[in-house]
């Protein structure tokens, strides 16, 4: 590897919209802002919602007059 051609890594902070701050190393020189992180994303927090598909399927069948085969 050649010397002195690679960008310098700096410690910056990524701040989420929920207020959580994550220290990371990057070639970027300024701090970053994130929309979601592991502290506020529904998948990681366990607050995710599941969609009730049965009602939607029944509505579709009713709309197009499908009967059970």
Swiss-Prot record:
Family assignment from sequence similarity: Belongs to the bacterial ribosomal protein bL31 family. Type A subfamily.
Assembly and binders: Part of the 50S ribosomal subunit.
HAMAP family in UniProt: Ribosomal_bL31_1 (MF_00501)
The entry's keywords: Metal-binding, Ribonucleoprotein, Ribosomal protein, RNA-binding, rRNA-binding, Zinc
Cofactor or coenzyme needed: Zn(2+)
Positions that bind Zn(2+): 16, 18, 37, 40
UniProt organism field: Buchnera aphidicola subsp. Cinara cedri (strain Cc)
Gene Ontology molecular function, alphabetical: metal ion binding; rRNA binding; structural constituent of ribosome
SUPFAM superfamilies xref list: L28p-like (SSF143800)
InterPro entries: Ribosomal_bL28/bL31-like_sf, Ribosomal_bL31, Ribosomal_bL31_A, Ribosomal_bL31_sf
Pfam families for this protein: Ribosomal_L31 (PF01197)
GO BP, sorted A to Z: translation
Superkingdom of the source species: Bacteria
Gene3D superfamilies in UniProt: Ribosomal protein L31
A single Gene Ontology CC term: ribosome
NCBIfam families: L31, PRK00019.1
Note accompanying the cofactor annotation: Binds 1 zinc ion per subunit.
Function noted in UniProt: Binds the 23S rRNA.
Protein name: Large ribosomal subunit protein bL31
